[in-house]
């Protein structure tokens, strides 16, 4: 299927590794021009080079999304470099701790306000698109609690903010729909990639790795590409009547009826 993404202009936050990198690469493979950001300047430059090697326009900047002014300024600059904006993918996450004031603060500033500031900067640009889409990366931690893979309370901070984001995007779908902007959430389950959290748990012999794998009904961890393909679909004209959805990608790990 041709998703109709060729020539579209996309911004992806937190896009130099894991899910974010796979999203940026997949969008570029589909012919999108792509802007990316992350904190590490070396990784940003390497990702830009990889994307540009696919024959599309690629731009990026090293920044911390907790700096709302810097994030908004970069989104405006990136859209200018790309010739406009059709797609915003908000992916960055702090993954900061299980509890404590600092964990709450970092997740609030990074996950929640990072997304809010990105949307605020992007919406005036997306209104000019005619086929605009926002895709927020959340987590199954937002939709299910109390299973036996993690200790009680382990995901309370992370899950709380991912749930807030899911609600935020659902509200955006309603408020931005009349402006021609769709908004959807993707909630991944356990995604494995080198250097990622599930790779580290495997290397450490953490029992959470074994327990999670045993509960995934498809018998394997997800890959970043599994998430990226779903994001590409939701961002594309092929999903032109999909808005306000939360697409769970977890290999039937969760037992919740969506």
Placement of each model-derived feature along the sequence:
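Catalytic loop of short-chain dehydrogenase/reductase
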Residues: 95-98, 135-164, 169-178, 190
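Short, small/polar-rich loop/turn modules that mediate ligand/substrate recognition or access, typified
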Residues: 177, 182, 242-244
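Short C-terminal tail/terminal secondary-structure segment
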Residues: 2, 232, 243-258
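The beta1-alpha1 cofactor-binding region of Rossmann-like NAD(H)/NADP(H)-dependent oxidoreductases
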Residues: 41-42, 62-74, 101, 225-226
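Conserved glycine-rich cofactor-binding loop
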Residues: 16-17
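A glycine/serine/threonine-rich, flexible loop-to-helix segment
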Residues: 1, 49, 53, 149-151, ...
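Substrate-binding pocket helix/loop in short-chain dehydrogenase/reductase
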Residues: 96-108, 154, 212
């Amino acid at each position: 299927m041709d998703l109709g993404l060729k020539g579209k202009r996309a911004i992806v936050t937190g896009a130099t590794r894991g899910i974010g990198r796979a999203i940026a690469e997949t969008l570029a493979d589909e012919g999108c021009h792509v802007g990316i950001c992350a904190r590490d300047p070396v990784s940003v430059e390497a990702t830009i080079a990889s994307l540009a090697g696919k024959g599309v326009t690629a731009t990026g900047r090293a920044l911390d999304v907790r700096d709302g002014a810097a994030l908004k300024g970069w989104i405006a600059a990136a859209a200018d470099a790309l010739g406009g904006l059709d797609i915003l993918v908000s992916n960055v996450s702090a993954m900061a701790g299980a509890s404590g004031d600092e964990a709450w603060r970092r997740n609030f500033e990074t996950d929640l306000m990072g997304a809010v500031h990105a949307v605020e900067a992007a919406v005036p640009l997306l209104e000019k698109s005619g086929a605009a889409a926002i895709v927020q990366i959340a987590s199954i931690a937002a939709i299910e609690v109390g299973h036996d893979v993690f200790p009680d309370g382990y995901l309370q901070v992370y899950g709380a903010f991912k749930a807030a984001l899911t609600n935020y995007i659902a509200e955006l779908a309603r408020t931005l729909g009349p402006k021609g902007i769709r908004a959807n959430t993707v909630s991944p389950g356990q995604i494995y990639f080198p250097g990622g959290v599930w790779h580290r748990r495997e290397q450490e012999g953490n029992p959470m790795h074994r327990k999670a794998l045993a509960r995934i009904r498809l018998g394997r961890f997800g890959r970043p590409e599994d998430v990226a393909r779903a994001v590409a679909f939701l961002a594309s004209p092929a999903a032109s009547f999909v808005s306000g959805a939360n697409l769970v990608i977890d290999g039937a790990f969760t037992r919740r009826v969506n």
